[in-house]
């Protein structure tokens, strides 16, 4: 999956078709992780207003969900209007590709998570203190009418090493506590060797 894609910088219909195509090619293995970003210059380079990036992301996700799930799609908003689009292919996953919303616990991002999110990608202080972050997220999305138990959460899993070797047992020690706190998925960063044979041997225990 993407972690994260600034979806508002892409044309919604093109993004929807591209992601759906990837989902078909991968046999339904795509997750779309999105966020609003922080760099004003990126939006200016695309001719977009940085101050409205939240709404631009929301409307992009609205279009994606419609094109993934319906056959004859019409849409109208202040940002974009179209009628009678038949977008193919449809994603393998139904009703569409799972959307993971990145961000801190604030009203705008939590409303977006409650509305669109299959999962949450914590950011900033909520990623640093994941246990408090998950608790705050669940309270926030519940206030927006979403069952927080239906939202997956990704957390960073630090890798323990002894020299050049991964200590898998030590690495996994924190997993039960994180799972109990509501973390459902884990990401980690490994310096993977470039040669296939070496990479296969390196990752075998993982």
Predicted regions located by residue number:
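Active-site-adjacent structural elements that line small-molecule/cofactor binding pockets in enzymes
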Residues: 1-206
């Amino acid at each position: 999956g993407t972690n994260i894609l600034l979806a508002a910088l892409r044309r919604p219909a093109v993004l929807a078709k591209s992601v759906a195509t990837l989902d078909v090619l991968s046999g339904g293995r795509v997750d779309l992780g999105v966020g609003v970003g922080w760099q004003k210059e990126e939006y200016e380079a695309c001719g977009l207003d940085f101050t409205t990036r939240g709404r631009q992301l929301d409307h992009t996700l609205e279009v994606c969900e419609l094109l993934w799930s319906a056959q004859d799609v019409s849409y109208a908003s202040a940002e974009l209007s179209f009628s009678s689009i038949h977008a193919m292919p449809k994603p393998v996953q139904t009703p569409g590709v799972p959307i993971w919303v990145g961000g801190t616990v604030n009203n705008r991002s939590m409303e977006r998570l409650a509305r669109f999110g299959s999962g949450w990608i914590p950011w900033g202080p909520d990623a640093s203190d994941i246990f408090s972050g998950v608790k705050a997220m669940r309270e926030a999305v519940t206030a927006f009418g979403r069952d927080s138990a239906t939202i997956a959460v990704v957390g960073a899993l630090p890798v323990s090493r002894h020299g050049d070797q991964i200590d898998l047992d030590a690495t996994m020690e924190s997993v039960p506590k994180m799972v109990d706190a509501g973390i459902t998925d884990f990401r980690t960063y490994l310096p993977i060797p470039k040669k296939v044979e070496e990479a296969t041997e390196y990752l075998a225990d993982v």
